[in-house]
């Protein structure tokens, strides 16, 4: 199991009388501490102690700006206090008298952490005056006045209350990240004010907060609304390009050794100050922690380290699937004489601020969800970060003192491989879920919806087609009763479709654990250490064997049921190398999905079906109802080809129980694809062709344009234009033909033929005469 957090260094020095033992110092329990250590706190009206922030000098002006404008853009450097202080100011100014102050975050970790921080500052219990809501977890009450939530949760609020009558202020935070849901919220809020709905609250205010973004463009989108700039307080940060990655290495992400080397060089050669390292995901982070620990263990602190006050290195991972308690540790001061090193995903670039960071190691890459048009699927890829993201990362080193940023890539990589800004998610991912949401909000014209950056029309039409294939919309593009039910589920449409199909057969118990497991982080622990790795793989194979050894979906169900039924689930997870936190989340998800299904089945018109057959067949048939777009047939050897019309080759991922059994298979369905050296299908199960025979034609039978009223109207107009042009060409051809016919008729009468013959004989006689004259001259 993971040994981190852990301290690598020499044995602790003898404890002096009155000195605290070396441990994480939790005398300041706040979840996030941003203020400078030397500055004194100030007391809020709620009685809590609040650190000093740059935003405090702008408090009165900022409150007045919110009062005076329906839309306001607030910009300032990360750490200026926007996220934690502005909602408090508005609460203390009385805005919550007209409704809640809602604050969105793109990530649930940030929503929870910031809510904890603000609740501590306001001296209240989390869930009372200050609460949060993330997917599958609502920690709020009727008393809640400030509610932090993911942007997806606000979208769910709009589904039930399009006029947002329960809110007085909506704050869209971290707008520069341009998530898909945030962009949709931009359009919905703009439309809410444009339509001037009679039920809209007059007091509703919208604040958009961004650290780095095209502010003029955003202001123009919201009717040239004012931009309120909070002057920053950043210390200078020196940048160093380490030149370990160049433009040719854009596709090569095997850079862990380089990251660890640079980090260790900082620890040995730089003065005291904590280190923040940016990597792309959990596997890279855990591997780097292990390698860094091994190197730090061999350091002689009497000779190797330039700063003699240092006795060790505290290594702390930070990624989304960690527990809240584990995440809290990264914000606590390290023990005396110990340097803290946080190895994190991109979440620490903007959403969270860690005090004491003086050195940043920028790995230059991030995991990003991109739509692959060749496969017709969204794929999580490792790509270079943007220049704006790189500046965000380096800014973390200049929060409390001057700092340094070590970029492992070269200047050429910066200029040639890194875009200026983040590509908005709406322009690079599937739109299926949000298009369904818009349809359920009676926004039928999804093509001309007010987007800040309009997505490619192809992505919209593809989303419409997928919704039709799931029976969420009809051939006219109108949402169906099933579609209205599907939008209530916090699942992708295809997975929701499979769950509802199972419910109609009264076998939802088979699908709900699987749906819950697919909704959380990867549950399998795959350690870096080779010895532990073999043990983990053996345990995972045993679990797959209990599910029949031939169905990855069923393996997830077995893990869910066995862990839940064990007397000590945490110990069971440790024994089987499974993430207990992920399983615990899956239990909560399954309970909420079960409640949604219960309410759905109470409806009088809910369809009921019967099927006589073994459970394993019912399970796979229900999966086919939602995953028939992800059907593949074996072509040659171990290669499969998708059946969606693209015929893309895919291979079964090595982690699957079906890996190396490909020759026994003919047809499969899969949950997702992963692109590395090959295109791999993950979470796979075998099926029979007859189960999808009637479903596959839906992938091809309808033109996507038919599902959009606007597209249909444009197609009709285009068809009329083409028909008119065709008729004009036809008439032109007819006119030409008639003229040619007249000429032919004139040429074919007796007189014309006689005249033509006479002209031919005359020309022939002339040629004979010319030839005779030539012979005489030469003779």
From Swiss-Prot:
A GO molecular function annotation here is: ATP binding
Please give the catalytic activity noted in the UniProt record.
ATP + H2O = ADP + phosphate + H(+)
The protein's matches in InterPro entries, at most eight in alphabetical order, are given as:
DEAD-box_helicase_OB_fold, DEAD/DEAH_box_helicase_dom, DNA/RNA_helicase_DEAH_CS, HA2_WH, Helicase-assoc_dom, Helicase_ATP-bd, Helicase_C-like, P-loop_NTPase
Q: Binding positions for ATP?
A: 76-83
Report the EC code(s) recorded for this entry.
3.6.4.13
What function does this protein fulfil?
Probable ATP-dependent RNA helicase.
This chain belongs to the protein called Probable ATP-dependent RNA helicase DHX40
Motif DEAH box boundaries: 173-176
Q: Which residues form the Helicase ATP-binding domain?
A: 63-231
Which PANTHER family does the record associate with it?
Answer: ATP-DEPENDENT RNA HELICASE (PTHR18934), ATP-DEPENDENT RNA HELICASE DHX40-RELATED (PTHR18934:SF271)
Against PROSITE patterns, the record matches this protein to:
DEAH_ATP_HELICASE (PS00690), HELICASE_ATP_BIND_1 (PS51192), HELICASE_CTER (PS51194)
> What family does the entry list?
Belongs to the DEAD box helicase family. DEAH subfamily.
Return the Polar residues bias intervals: 42-53
Main EC class the enzyme belongs to: hydrolase
Tell me the organism.
Mus musculus
Q: Does the keyword Nucleotide-binding apply?
A: yes
Q: Where is this region: Disordered?
A: 1-53
Task: Enumerate the UniProt keywords alphabetically.
Answer: ATP-binding, Helicase, Hydrolase, Nucleotide-binding
Q: Where do Basic and acidic residues bias regions lie?
A: 13-41
The Helicase C-terminal domain, residue ranges: 263-442
> Known SMART domains for this protein?
DEXDc (SM00487), HA2 (SM00847), HELICc (SM00490)
């Amino acid at each position: 199991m993971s040994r981190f957090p852990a301290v690598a260094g020499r044995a602790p020095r003898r404890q002096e009388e009155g000195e605290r033992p070396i441990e994480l110092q939790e005398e300041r329990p706040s979840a996030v501490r941003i203020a400078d250590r030397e500055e004194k706190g100030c007391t809020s009206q709620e009685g809590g102690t609040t650190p000093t922030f740059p935003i405090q000098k702008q408090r009165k002006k900022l409150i007045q700006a919110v009062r005076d404008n329906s839309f306001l853009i607030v910009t300032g450097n990360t750490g200026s206090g926007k996220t934690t202080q502005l909602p408090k100011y508005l609460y203390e100014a009385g805005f919550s008298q007209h409704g809640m102050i809602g604050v969105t975050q793109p990530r649930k970790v940030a929503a929870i952490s910031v809510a904890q921080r603000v609740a501590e500052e306001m001296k209240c219990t989390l869930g009372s005056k200050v609460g949060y809501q993330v997917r599958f977890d609502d920690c709020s009450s009727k008393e809640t006045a400030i509610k932090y939530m993911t942007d997806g949760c606000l979208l769910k609020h709009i589904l039930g209350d399009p006029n947002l009558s329960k809110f007085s202020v909506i704050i869209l935070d971290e707008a520069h990240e341009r998530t898909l849901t945030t962009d949709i919220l931009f359009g919905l809020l703009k439309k809410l004010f444009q339509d001037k709905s009679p039920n809209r609250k007059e007091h509703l205010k919208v604040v958009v907060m961004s650290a780095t973004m095209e502010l003029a463009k955003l202001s123009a989108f919201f009717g040239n609304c004012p931009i309120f700039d909070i002057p920053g307080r950043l210390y200078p940060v020196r940048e160093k390009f380490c030149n370990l990655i160049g433009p040719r290495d854009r596709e090569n992400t095997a850079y862990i050794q380089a990251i660890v080397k640079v980090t260790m060089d900082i620890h040995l050669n730089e003065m005291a100050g904590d280190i923040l390292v940016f990597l792309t995901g959990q596997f890279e982070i855990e591997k780097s922690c292990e390698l860094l620990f091994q190197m730090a263990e061999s350091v002689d602190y009497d000779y190797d380290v330039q700063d003699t006050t240092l006795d060790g290195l505290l290594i702390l991972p930070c990624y989304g699937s960690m527990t809240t308690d584990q995440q809290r540790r990264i914000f606590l001061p390290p023990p005396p004489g110990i340097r803290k090193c946080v190895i994190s995903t991109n979440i620490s670039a903007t959403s969270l601020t860690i005090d004491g960071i003086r050195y940043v190691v920028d790995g230059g890459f991030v995991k990003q969800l991109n739509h692959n048009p060749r496969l017709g699927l969204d794929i999580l890829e490792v790509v270079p970060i943007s220049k704006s993201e790189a500046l965000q990362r380096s800014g973390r080193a200049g929060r409390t003192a001057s700092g340094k940023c070590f970029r492992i890539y070269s200047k050429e990589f910066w200029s040639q491989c890194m875009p200026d800004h983040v590509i908005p998610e709406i322009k690079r991912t599937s739109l299926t879920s949000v298009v369904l949401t818009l349809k359920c909000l009676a926004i039928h014209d999804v093509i001309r919806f007010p987007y800040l950056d309009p997505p490619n029309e192809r992505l919209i039409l593809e989303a419409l087609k997928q919704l039709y294939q799931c029976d969420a919309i009809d051939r006219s593009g109108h949402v169906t009763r099933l579609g209205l039910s599907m939008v209530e589920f916090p699942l992708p449409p295809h997975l929701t479709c499979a769950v509802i199909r199972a419910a109609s057969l009264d076998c939802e118990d088979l699908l709900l654990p699987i749906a819950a497991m697919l909704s959380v982080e990867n549950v399998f622990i795959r350690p870096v250490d080779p010895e532990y790795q073999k043990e983990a793989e053996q345990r995972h194979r045993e679990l797959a064997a209990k599910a029949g050894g031939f169905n990855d979906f069923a393996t997830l169900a077995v893990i869910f049921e066995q862990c839940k039924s064990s007397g000590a689930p945490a110990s069971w997870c440790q024994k089987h190398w499974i993430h207990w936190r992920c399983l615990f989340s899956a239990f909560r998800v399954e309970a909420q999905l079960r409640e949604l299904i219960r309410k759905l089945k109470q409806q009088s018109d809910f369809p009921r079906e019967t099927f006589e057959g073994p459970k394993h067949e019912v399970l796979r048939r229900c999966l086919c109802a939602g995953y028939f777009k992800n059907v593949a047939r074996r072509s040659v050897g171990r290669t499969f080809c998708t059946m969606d019309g693209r015929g893309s080759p895919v291979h079964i991922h090595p982690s699957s129980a079906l890996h190396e059994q490909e020759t026994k298979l003919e047809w499969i369905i899969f949950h997702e694809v992963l692109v590395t050296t090959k295109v791999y299908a993950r979470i796979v199960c075998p099926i029979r062709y007859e189960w999808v025979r009637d479903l596959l034609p839906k992938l091809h039978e309808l033109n996507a344009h038919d599902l959009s009223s606007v597209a249909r109207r444009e197609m009709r107009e285009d068809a009329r234009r083409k028909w008119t042009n065709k008729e004009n060409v036809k008439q032109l051809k007819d006119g030409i033909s008639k003229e040619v016919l007249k000429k032919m008729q004139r040429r074919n009468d007796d007189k014309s033929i006689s005249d033509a013959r006479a002209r031919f004989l005359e020309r022939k006689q002339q040629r004979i005469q010319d030839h005779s004259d030539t012979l005489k001259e030469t003779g």
